[in-house]
């Protein structure tokens, strides 16, 4: 629940938020054409959006298990008023699933991405720390330096009874810029948590949680941080009423 019901978003769980789209579905298959993610134009450049972001997903389901396979692709060019006009390609492929074993359940997931930041991936800023750098860069010749990365997560839970559920999880995210020197050393973040959902009444529950997160930055990109490998420990709880 930390970080606004973070759910390991940006730390093993790939997430891009909600954007305008046109979606088609048949059975367990979904195909979507989505508004691309870019930053604003400025005095030196404009973005030439040629095609929409394209995403596809297929969901497999059984009585006690599920499996989701997904992928996405985004492409645009940067038109500099002076100099080159580089193309930016970003994509992701991933797999996630889960299974119930009586009162226990386990969820696993993983993904690999190129230029995830340009794609619009959510960057985790736990405790106000700076998200790891998962975006491309432009060099002095106005060429694109790509960024590649991956993430994974695992969650294990136990439904003790109708009132109590115990859950623990761990997530990891890594990204590396394709440049020489310290800036290409790669950055990572991992998080582990343990919580308990307590059902007080129908629609009313409380979730106490403890957790730990650790960041590892390439030193040259640590803007506003006191150290290259900060970490945080947190403890708290939330309550929620569903009407």
Predicted regions and their residues:
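Residues that define the transmembrane beta-barrel architecture of outer-membrane proteins
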Residues: 16-20, 25-27, 48-54, 87-93, ...
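Detector for outer-membrane/organellar transmembrane beta-barrel domains
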Residues: 61-190
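C-terminal/domain-terminus segments
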Residues: 38-51, 55-57, 170-195, 218, ...
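Outer membrane beta-barrel
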Residues: 1-40, 48-55, 59-63, 98-102, ...
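Outer-membrane beta-barrel "beta-signal"
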Residues: 198-200, 204, 229-243
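C-terminal closing repeat unit and adjoining cap/tail of repeat-based domains
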Residues: 192-211, 215-217
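Transmembrane beta-strand segments that form the barrel wall of outer-membrane beta-barrel proteins
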Residues: 7-9, 29-37, 67-75, 165-175, ...
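Residues on the lipid-exposed face of transmembrane beta-strands in outer-membrane beta-barrel proteins
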Residues: 22-26, 56-60, 95-99, 108, ...
